[in-house]
From Swiss-Prot:
Entry's family note: Belongs to the COG7 family.
Function: Required for normal Golgi function.
GO cellular component terms, A-Z: Golgi apparatus; Golgi membrane; Golgi transport complex; intracellular membrane-bounded organelle; nucleolus; trans-Golgi network membrane
Name listed for the protein in its UniProt record: Conserved oligomeric Golgi complex subunit 7
Superkingdom classification of source: Eukaryota
Pfam family membership, one: COG7
Species for this entry: Homo sapiens
Gene Ontology annotations of biological process type: glycosylation; Golgi organization; intracellular protein transport; protein glycosylation; protein localization to Golgi apparatus; protein localization to organelle; protein stabilization; retrograde transport, vesicle recycling within Golgi
Length: 770
């Protein structure tokens, strides 16, 4: 039997019994299941007895071993107690040793201090004695004119003097030593100049060593600067006396300076510890000592160029300077972080500072330049067709000038002149809009839209309308170009001047700007050539405005901007004026006919058969000539509007949707949304005709019964024309014709649902008492 399963964690009694019976299936099958069960029980009892016996034996052995374990534990406790006592004793010994050692070390320190003082005193005495010895021998040494020996003596005297600081005659000795150094410098100066001029490396190294030892390195560098500065200044003088233009002279100067840079760097690297810094100072001093100075040369060059060319010439000069600056930057860039950035910044300032006054007033210069160029763009011509042509051609000229101004701003100010640029652009657009408006007024006069003779014959002339449509298309080009240009301007400003915008700044205050900018500059080493910023220090208010613009562009995105809001609004108004011109070119001839209605004598004069009018049917009357002309003119409008308004022209479509026509639909009119602009124009002209007709009718002082019927016939004719064109007659016109047709005895009843003032006016005209 397998008794090992009793030890399993998942032991199941039923499963074990079933397994035991399955093992003895033969006996169970023969009907001896009870016997088999009895056998299993007996085996289990025997197994239990064996287990009990084993447990008793194990327990007995454990009880026998317990006293031994207890004894071991007791012994361990005694050993731990003894160890604790020993640790306490060791701790006391260590504490005592530390106290004894501390006292010993204190004594040693005091002894060492005494020793150091004694050595210092001995050295001081030796140096003091050395000063006396050297002072006595120095005159003899100078007679040898051996610079190395004299330098060694002076170095010894200098070291001795450091030990004599507290002596009463210390200052006198300092003066004496400086006088000796001056004598040495005077003695060596011819050789120094010769060494630097001939680029003698070994001899120059000797002088560097000598002057370093006697603390006269700045004086030695002054000789170096003077030697090479003289050569560069002479080259500039020669250029100035030549017949070359100023930009060529500047190019020659910068070539000489850049050549000197590369030559001197190679030589100075062998002689000086900081060759780049030394040569940078040479260039800084040379640029500052030029005669005539660069600012005066630039001033003369700009003045000679005149107002029309001053900015162009200035940019030519600046391009030469920028090319030179780029060459220096490339030369310094590989090891820029190793150089003295203060000196690099001074060099950058020395190169660019002559242009600072012009950069600060760039906005004014650009505005003057743009206005001069805009004045050269003709818009006004003798013939209307020529004016229209010039207006169309002026669009590309206008935005060509604006784009060129942006390029100049980037080239000359690196984006810092953005505020001045925006101001100049606004002036440019204002000038253009003013000229455009004047041209529109001139076209109106040439087309005689403002002064149509009262007695002129009614005739169709669509030339003015055709020209007006071309002008509207030009306005569409202006609006489209303005949107594109504004987007490009925003992107250009952000990409160029965006580097000046600190990531941490918020445009709440100027102080916040400057604080964040200073913090950023401390946190990251930057390239002074790329970070040149003339505006922040010299015009902080304009710089703050620039930061506002950049912050807005960055936060809201360059597509959501308002840089040219005023010019855009002005161009929109210009488009509106062009719409008015086109509208007037069509409508004013109708208006001229309608305004004559109130002055016609026939309204209050009895016609032939006046007494029979009441008996005559309405269709016996025919519309008068004035309304027939107007009706025929309006009927011809679709044919004349369609070709010009619905042609495939995106600029024209843009302008037509941006403009607003006069005489909009009356409130409450159910009009379908018309995508066809020709229908919109037709509706506007029709409504203008009806409203003007109504106003003219109400100005008639008196109507005879016949005239009332005639006028009603005229109005019905116009209403039929409107119906034929699919247009709704105005409510006022319908009311008037109703009142004109109403019999006097029915007038009170009919007029109850109509506007009171209108009913009263018509009643007065008809002499109806109600």
């Amino acid at each position: 039997m397998d008794f090992s399963k009793f030890l399993a964690d998942d032991f199941d009694v039923k499963e074990w019994i079933n397994a035991a019976f399955r093992a003895g299936s033969k006996e169970a099958a023969s009907g001896k299941a009870d016997g088999h069960a009895a056998t299993l029980v007996m085996k289990l009892q025997l197994f239990i007895q064996e287990v009990n016996h084993a447990v008793e034996e194990t327990s007995h052995q454990a009880l026998q071993n317990m006293p031994k374990v207890l004894r071991d534990v007791e012994a361990l406790k005694q050993e731990a107690s003894f160890l604790k006592e020993q640790m306490i004793l060791v701790k006391e010994d260590i504490k005592k040793f530390e106290q004894d050692t501390s006292q010993s070390m204190q004594v040693l320190v005091e002894i060492d201090q005494v020793k150091s003082r004694m050595q210092l005193a001995a050295e001081s005495l030796q140096e003091a004695d050395k000063w006396s010895t050297l002072s006595a021998d120095i005159e003899e040494t100078f007679k040898t004119q051996d610079i190395a020996v004299i330098s060694a003596k002076l170095t010894g005297m200098q070291n001795s003097l450091m030990m004599l600081v507290d002596t009463p005659d210390y200052s006198e000795k300092c003066v004496h030593l400086e006088a000796l150094k001056n004598r040495l410098e005077a003695l060596a100066s011819p050789q120094i100049v010769a060494a630097f001029t001939s680029q003698a490396v070994d001899q120059s190294k000797v002088f560097v060593k000598v002057f370093t030892e006697i603390d006269r390195m700045p004086q030695l560098l002054a000789y170096y600067y003077k030697c090479h500065k003289v050569q560069l200044l002479a080259a500039w003088q020669e250029l100035c006396q030549s017949d070359l233009s100023l930009d060529r002279q500047l190019t020659g100067l910068y070539d000489a300076l850049l050549g000197a840079w590369h030559t001197q760097i190679q030589w100075a690297t062998q002689v000086f510890q900081k060759p780049h810094e030394v040569v940078m100072v040479l260039l800084i001093q040379t640029l500052g000592a030029l005669m005539p100075s660069l600012p005066s040369c630039l001033s003369n060059g700009v003045e000679r160029a005149g107002p029309e060319q001053e900015l162009t010439r200035l940019l030519e000069f600046y391009d030469a300077t920028a090319h030179f600056a780029k060459g220096l930057e490339m030369a310094l860039l590989p090891h820029l972080h190793e150089h003295n950035l203060v000196k690099v910044t001074e060099l950058v300032d020395a190169v660019y500072d002559p242009y600072k006054p012009y950069q600060l007033k760039y906005g004014d210069m650009e505005e003057s330049n743009l206005l001069i160029q805009m004045s050269a763009v003709p818009l006004e011509h003798g013939e209307v067709i020529d004016c229209v042509q010039e207006l169309s051609h002026s669009v590309n000229k206008l935005f060509g000038l604006a784009s060129a101004a942006v390029d100049r701003c980037v080239r000359f100010t690196n984006g810092l002149g953005t505020c001045g640029l925006l101001s100049a652009l606004k002036s440019l657009f204002a000038k253009y809009v003013s000229d455009f408006t004047s041209t529109l007024q001139s076209i109106r006069k040439k087309c005689k839209l403002d002064h149509i003779p009262p007695n002129s014959l009614f005739q169709e002339d669509w030339t003015a309308f055709q020209n007006s449509i071309r002008i509207i298309a030009t306005c569409g080009e202006l609006l489209r170009h303005c949107g594109d240009f504004e987007q490009q301007l925003a992107n250009r400003i952000l990409s160029t001047a965006g580097k000046y915008l600190s990531d941490s700044c918020s445009p709440r205050s100027l102080a916040g700007f400057q604080e964040s900018i200073l913090t950023d500059k401390k946190n990251s080493a930057k390239n002074p050539w790329q970070e040149y910023n003339y505006l922040q220090k010299d015009n902080p208010a304009e710089y703050a405005s620039l930061m506002e613009i950049l912050y807005t562009l960055k936060e809201k995105g360059s597509s959501n901007h308002n840089l040219l809001a005023a010019p855009r609004a002005a161009l929109t108004r210009l488009n509106q004026q062009a719409h008015q011109l086109a509208f007037d070119s069509v409508f004013l001839r109708i208006k001229q006919q309608l305004l004559l209605i109130s002055k016609m004598d026939s309204w209050n004069t009895a016609g032939i058969g006046e007494t029979l009018t009441d008996e005559l049917p309405a269709f016996s009357l025919t519309p008068l000539e004035y309304i027939s002309n107007i009706g025929q003119y309006i009927m011809s409008l679709p044919l004349n509007l369609e070709p010009f308004v619905t042609q495939e022209d995106s600029a024209l479509e843009l302008a037509l949707h941006a403009g607003k026509l006069p005489f909009p639909p009356e409130q409450g009119d159910e009009l379908p949304e018309l995508d066809n602009m020709a229908d919109n124009w037709l509706g506007s002209i029709a409504r203008a005709t009806m409203q003007t007709y109504c106003d003219a009718i109400l100005q008639i002082p008196e109507l005879s019964p016949h005239s009332a019927k005639q006028l009603a016939t005229d109005i019905d004719y116009l209403i039929n024309v409107m119906d034929a064109l699919g247009l709704q007659p105005s409510r006022t016109l319908q009311h008037i014709v109703t009142l004109l047709k109403t019999r006097p005895e029915d007038y009170r009843q009919v007029s109850k649902g109509l506007p009171r003032r209108l009913a009263t006016t018509v009643a007065t005209m008809r002499s109806v008492n109600y």
